[in-house]
Amino acid sequence: MRKRTFLGASLALGLGGFSGLVAPSTQAKPAGSKSFHGRGEILWDTYGVPHVYGKDEAAVFYGFGYAQAQNHGNIVVHLYGEARGRAAEYWGPQFADSDRWMLSNDVPARALAWYRASTPQFRQNLDAFAAGINAYDAANPGKIDPKVAVVLPVSGVDVMAHAHRLMNFIYVAPMERTMGAPVPGAGNNGSNAWAVAPSKSQSGHTMLLANPHLPWPTSYFTYFEADLNGPGIKMYGATQVGLPVLRFCFNDHMGFTNTVNSMLGATNYELKLSGDGYLFDGKVLPFKTRTTSFKIRQPDGALKTETLTIRESVHGPAFTRADGKTLALRVAGLDRPDGLKQYWDMGMSKNFAEFETILKRLQVPTFNIVYADKAGHIQYMDNGVLPKHPKGDLAYWRGDVPGDTSATLWTDVHSYDELPKVIDPATGWIQNTNDPPWVATYPQVIHAENFPPYVAPPGPESLRSQQSAHLLADPSKISFDDFVARKLSTHTLMADRVLPDLIAAAQGDPDPEVQAAVNLLKAWNRETVADSKAALLFETWANRFSPGNFTSLANYKVKWLPSDPIGTPKGVADPAKALDMLKAAIGEMKTKYGAIDRPFGEVSRFAIDKVDLPGNGGFGNTGIFRTITWGPLKDGKRIPVHGETWVSLVEFSTPIKAKGLMSYGNASQPGSPHRSDQLKHLSDKTLRTLWTTRAQVEQHIEGRTPF
């Protein structure tokens, strides 16, 4: 069966000139482990979830680092090597572009500066996390792939460098966007988040859903579930591998989650070159230049040294693309070293006053943040470090901005008070599925016209976001069981909007195959589940009706309307054309699947290693809340490439109730039993009880690791 693959972090883009500061030639001292003897233990439950118990804060970080190395060591250590800007030295020329990007954007050097700028306690925490990784390798020689282990030992600076790279130069300013290549996963990445207030809850308790969607191949996007405990420390949730803090987190008092937002924290400035310089406000300015070097391992194992010329304009580091354009990159938030500490403090908070005070630091450079607490408060925030601009909308600032004038050079960013947010709405609920902030609840309480046009586009609202709102907007109060059931919904909203018109258009067609298709679609309950015999047919037709990953509105009778943001688009503009699309879809179904009524789960499989189960869920842009992005057909089957990853649903009762799932399992190391052991839940549309207390954990122990 399929194995989980590694999503390459470097693309061959033919990078030209580079700019930035030279990386330090030495790494920080590797983190040791002797001082942690007798300071804690890890209880491993039967799903491979580490429950870390430390005698102090640093010991908790140490245990968390050890646990990540045990379950995901190959990925974590590889990512740290990439963040050093030395991946080509370790693994060859396919990583040279990545190294150039790291060095040109000063990631290794800035990581060292950020590490030094951290509080003494948080530096200890970073060192402890790294020490845990090193300790796992020392205690288990050979478990981490020797080709990857060349990076070891790691240090607290490596931890900071990876976080800096991930946040600022993958999420905020990915290499591909500057260099003119498609950003990997840009059309699919997403998440779901809900918060329900006591007024909307049947029990009178607040509820929170965390449900990120990211690629399934192992990479910096892979999630890891953990339970962290110590004096004054109690937090449960998930994070991306290599990070020492939880990004999706709850405790007994509150919880928060993230979704990717459209906030644009980086600008590409197109430079007009003149001689050896560039034009700026009518003058020719020289580039600041310097050189550094890095090593590239050759196929025979020899190391070749490459000299890197680094150029910098008034905007930032300059790059020459394959199309001949020279662009300078300006990234907001590079003066904010405490993003990791902010996440840690968010997880340590006990109430909304504490949480909001922490949010106001604006150290986390991007992401929507959705919050809920036991006292009944809920919040949505379009969070990030957002540059202030005098004009222009999001599309303008996402493009190549003229760099020959100071009129476009931003120098300030928006404050917390200036960013869109919804706090304790009268509706009693909040949602976000990566769409603009304006329908965080409905009826709307914030509006695009009250914010600069570069904050977020006014619309359209995606069908997944509309379905999310519909799942919460009915007048009934929601029990926890109903909360779970709504989250597991596989209903296809797009079918509600267009199937009546399509069926009407096809009803009188004399072709018996068309009538067979009509009968399938009429009988379909519009659920994308394993035994559905019409879901694949509808998906195949919908891909023609709404091309561009199901985003085109051209064939709808009624386009998306700001006045009806969760009721449009709808209808079929040209019934005859839609019928032709159905006939083409019938032919495609017969060619690809052998019949027009293949059960969805025969073709769509949840398969990792030797586990191969019927799938459910589908493309978010068809209005399915349970998002699974299916990969290309291979040997008559397809598997997820993106979608449902970490899920947690929490009711802040006494004690709290928590359900969850890590779709692809909580480990990626070869031979781990936890690489695929949760796929059965995913296939059955069920969730696990999350064991949040020591008493619960003790009943489900698979192993103990004292330290």
Model-derived features with residue positions:
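Residue-level detector of secondary-structure transition/capping positions
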Residues: 14-15, 363
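Signal peptide processing junction and immediate N-terminal pro/mature segment
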Residues: 21-30
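C-terminal/peripheral segments of proteins
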Residues: 29-510, 523-707
